[in-house]
A protein has these predicted regions:
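N-terminal helical cap/lid subdomain that shapes the substrate entry/recognition surface
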Residues: 2-112, 116-117
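Short beta-strand/loop segments at the ligand-binding rim of alpha/beta enzyme cores
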Residues: 120
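Asp-based, Mg2+/Mn2+-dependent phosphohydrolase catalytic module
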Residues: 1-8, 16-19, 39-40, 108, ...
Length: 241
């Protein structure tokens, strides 16, 4: 059965898995500081963020997400730092400075084909960035494409593979789960998570681009129907059969 909607993961699927420059990204808001009474340096600021985030990652586990606005607000108030810009803009500046978003090969053509075929699209991403930040990033990467909705775990508490975040996407779609496909690059999180929520999984496994999840992906874990594609052209071929 052909899908009425295809949902996508973001990092490693629609966009290449980024290489983050944490210190450069975290210190990118320093030109916008209006008050820094403790004379916190860029290095101190970045190191504190890394240590705090590592602690939070342990506390939250694998299935609950932190929102970047809350995290950044804590850090700024901890150091009594004030900015000349709102927290939303500070988030975007950090996001842009951490890494450059680059679409995976042929993603734009694939999305155009889906639009032409009347197949709706959406994004479900494990991300501490706000949904607004991801929407902004997608607008830059795919200016001619309109997603029905974009869901980040930061806005909806739960992280893939927890079923709740997939259920939210299904509710937003207004469709039955069997009419939706989910494309992702991580078997444990995307493929198994989607299957458990009743969606049809598509493993995006492009070995021509760097992806930190390649080494974790073991297809022997998959004992259910799914599509395994090495590029977006293969997805188009499947849809045109």
């Amino acid at each position: 059965m052909k899908p009425e909607m295809i949902l996508f993961d973001f990092g490693g699927t629609l966009a290449c898995d980024p290489i983050y420059n944490m210190e450069e990204g975290n210190s990118a808001i320093f030109p916008y500081i209006t008050e820094n009474p403790h004379n916190v340096t860029k290095e101190q600021f970045s190191n504190f963020i890394k240590e705090l985030f590592d602690e939070i990652r342990v506390l939250r586990g694998e299935f609950i997400e932190l929102h970047e606005h809350i995290f950044l607000r804590y850090v700024l108030e901890y150091f009594d730092i004030k900015l000349s810009i709102p927290i939303e803009e500070a988030e975007w500046i950090i996001c842009k400075s951490l890494a450059e978003n680059v679409m995976t090969p042929g993603a734009d053509k694939m999305l155009k084909t889906l639009t032409e075929k009347g197949i709706r699209t959406g994004i479900v991403s494990n991300l501490c960035w706000s949904g607004a930040a991801l929407e902004r990033a997608m607008g830059e990467l795919f200016p001619e494409h309109k997603f029905d909705f974009i869901i980040t775990s930061s806005e909806y508490i739960f992280r893939k593979p927890d079923r709740h975040i997939f259920d939210m996407a299904i509710r937003k779609s207004g469709l039955k789960p069997e009419k939706i496909w989910f494309c992702g690059n991580f078997i444990e999180v995307d493929i198994i998570g989607a299957k458990n929520a009743g969606l049809f999984p598509v493993l995006y496994d492009n070995r021509d681009i760097p992806d930190r999840f390649h080494k974790y992906n073991d297809t022997s874990k998959i004992d259910f129907p799914y599509h395994h594609i090495g590029g977006w052209g293969e997805l188009i071929e499947i849809l045109e059969k």
